[in-house]
Swiss-Prot record:
It is found in: Membrane. Belongs to the bactofilin family. The chain crosses the membrane at residues 10-30, 34-54. Pfam families: Bactofilin. It is a multi-pass membrane protein. InterPro entries: BacA/B. This is Uncharacterized membrane protein YuaD. Keywords: Membrane, Plasmid, Transmembrane, Transmembrane helix. One of its GO terms (cellular component) is membrane.
Amino acid sequence: MRAYCPHYQFMLFWIASLCWFSLIVLWGTGFYSLLFYIISVLLIIILYTLYFIGENMFSKGKIKESDSTTTIISKNTSFVGDISSGEKIIIHGKINGNINTNNGVVFIDKGGVVNGRVLCEKMILNGELYGECCCSTLDVYENGFLQGEVSYRFLEIRNGGCITGIVNKVTDEVQNNVSELVKARES
């Protein structure tokens, strides 16, 4: 399956626009020898665009496999159990259980509630967490509320954010030891 990136589509639009503008200028000034090259470049861009975008345009009924590895718990969803992922987890609903993302990001949005332990590289809290949180970076937003025990290296609490319980700043040496223990525990 061919890869497609929306940034290329935007870039191709500007290249095609530049070629079209150059084509009009050359036609108006009478430089017909360059006109041939500009038309050729414009056709190449159009064919290139159809090659990559046309696949999406004419493939009715085919569901394209997503490259995204983000786990999303939607607003009206309740989940009981543990979640383990290597990437990003976005929580809009409710989770009763533990969340483990070794090098990932956990984002608990406004209205999202987690009862359990969260282990992650970065935690963005705009909802509620009741339990334990161990992360490298913790950002508590305006609506964020954490009740329990927190271990972090970097902490930011915005106006309105709240942490109640035990708060521990972890040094690099302790963080490395914790990482080794987590890896040993998973083995």
